[in-house]
Amino acid sequence: MALAIGLCLGLGIPISLIIGAVIGYYFAGKYFKKQLKENPPITESQIRAMYQQMGRKPTEKQIKQIMATFKKNNK
């Protein structure tokens, strides 16, 4: 009887920890990707400011091109 309880605890706890870690990793990755999509690491205004600091006036095409590159790399 005591052996059966010890065996159940000895196998049940590590298996449930592994399953919990896998599920947590999956949902954390999904949440992180959602946050990146909603709040990109750089915005169009930041790109404009970066160009102005370099002494250049960016065209709308350049800004859209840079944003498309960021979105492509985040997928």
Curated annotation (Swiss-Prot):
Chief location category: membrane
Compartmental location: Membrane
Statement: the UniProt record of this protein carries the keyword Ligase: no
Membrane topology: Single-pass membrane protein
Keyword tags: Membrane, Transmembrane, Transmembrane helix
One Gene Ontology cellular component: membrane
Lineage top rank: taxon: Bacteria
Residue stretches spanning the membrane: 5-27
HAMAP family: UPF0154
Family affiliation: Belongs to the UPF0154 family.
Descriptive protein name: UPF0154 protein MYPE400
Biological source species: Malacoplasma penetrans (strain HF-2) (Mycoplasma penetrans)
